[in-house]
Amino acid sequence: GAWRFPGAWPDANFNLAHLKTLIRKLEAAKFDAFFMADHMAVLNMPMAALKRSHTVTSFEPFTLLSALSQVTAHIGLIATASTTFDAPYHIARRFASLDHISNGRAGWNIVTTSNPDAALNFGHDEQMDHDERYRRAREFYEVVTGLWDSFADDAFVRDVESGVYFDPARMHTLGHKDEYLSVRGPLNIARPVQGWLLSGLAGDGAGGRVRLRPPARRGSGGSDFHGRQSLARRAALLRRHQGPRGQGARAGRR
């Protein structure tokens, strides 16, 4: 792997000092964002290959990006988070916290986790099938964005004289109950700086087209991450994704 190249840092993905230097250079070079992949299990590959892979150890994304936010000011910080092996309340809190800590620079790479070994790490005997994972992902995203809308932007008045910290009329309880998830709310964190965060997903399968509604503030929106493809293929994917996203757009709670 690349960790063996002459002059490379063998522990580059697990060395905080190196990552701080790297992200400062990326920001100075005007990169838009720092994207951090994540895995919910050690990758399923033959041991002969695995023993040569740097992927067996890496930082948890939210912890690392929170640290990197303190040595940068402008670059976006995109964390990978699974909708299959986590709870939407946890995810909503983590991203809201990261967005406040970074002053509105957080982003969410949505994944459904295809590695079957991940299921064994979270109390399941087998992986949820592909289509079901994406149905859950759609509902999961709706819950997370709903939780981000728990408080209006002006809810926290913090009036010292009256002793009123927030306006109850500006708080919204989600009360979600559907096929996969039951979440009452509200979130116990103020609305993210961006309102709804920049969110995106990888892949181009029919099941993977999760409808992403654009956030309400700062011009953030949805993104789709794809591998190397022909120009015609990319154009077709763009047309396919733009339709559902445009139809599903709405403003967030204000």
What function would you assign to each model-found segment?
Residues 34-36, 75-81, 104-110, 197-202, ...:
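Hydrophobic faces of well-ordered beta-strands that scaffold small-molecule active sites
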Residues 27-28, 65-73, 99-105, 246-252:
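Acidic (Asp/Glu)-rich catalytic clusters
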Residues 19-29, 95-99, 238, 242-248:
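Short amphipathic alpha-helices and their capping/turn segments at secondary-structure boundaries
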Residues 87, 92-216, 231, 235, ...:
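Internal, glycine-rich beta/alpha segment that forms the wall or movable "lid"
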